[in-house]
Amino acid sequence: MIPTYMNIMLAFTISLLGMLTYRSHLVASLLCLEGMMMSLFIMATLIASNTHFPLINIMPIILLVFAACEAAVGLALLISISNTYGLDYIHNLNLLQC
């Protein structure tokens, strides 16, 4: 396997482990999720540049759109939780409460 792909897969794995380890704080979870999305974007860009299939070139752009939407929703949720509770703990997030 090419070392570039291995480094990107290692970055994704480290971000995934960080997501599983630091799941009590929303800021840490959002940063790890953003790291996972960026490593997926780099991997998709490398795959799109190495293959000569023209329809796959749009895949990294679509992935960036989803990453931007995920970041916007995550930051809005962070602001809402920090204004309501004053903390960024995920266990404060309960959607069943009114």
From Swiss-Prot:
Give the GO molecular function terms: NADH dehydrogenase (ubiquinone) activity
Q: Which InterPro entries match?
A: NADH_UbQ_OxRdtase_chain4L/K (IPR001133), NUOK/Mnh_C1-like (IPR039428)
Gene Ontology CC annotation, any one? mitochondrial inner membrane
Q: What is its EC number?
A: 7.1.1.2
The superkingdom of the source organism is: Eukaryota
Q: Where is this protein localized, as stated in its record?
A: Mitochondrion inner membrane
What's the catalysed reaction?
Answer: a ubiquinone + NADH + 5 H(+)(in) = a ubiquinol + NAD(+) + 4 H(+)(out)
Q: What residues form the membrane-spanning segments? A: 1-21, 27-47, 61-81
Pfam families tied to this protein: Oxidored_q2
Name the family the entry cites: Belongs to the complex I subunit 4L family.
UniProt function note? Core subunit of the mitochondrial membrane respiratory chain NADH dehydrogenase (Complex I) which catalyzes electron transfer from NADH through the respiratory chain, using ubiquinone as an electron acceptor. Part of the enzyme membrane arm which is embedded in the lipid bilayer and involved in proton translocation.
Q: What is this protein called?
A: NADH-ubiquinone oxidoreductase chain 4L
Gene that encodes it: MT-ND4L
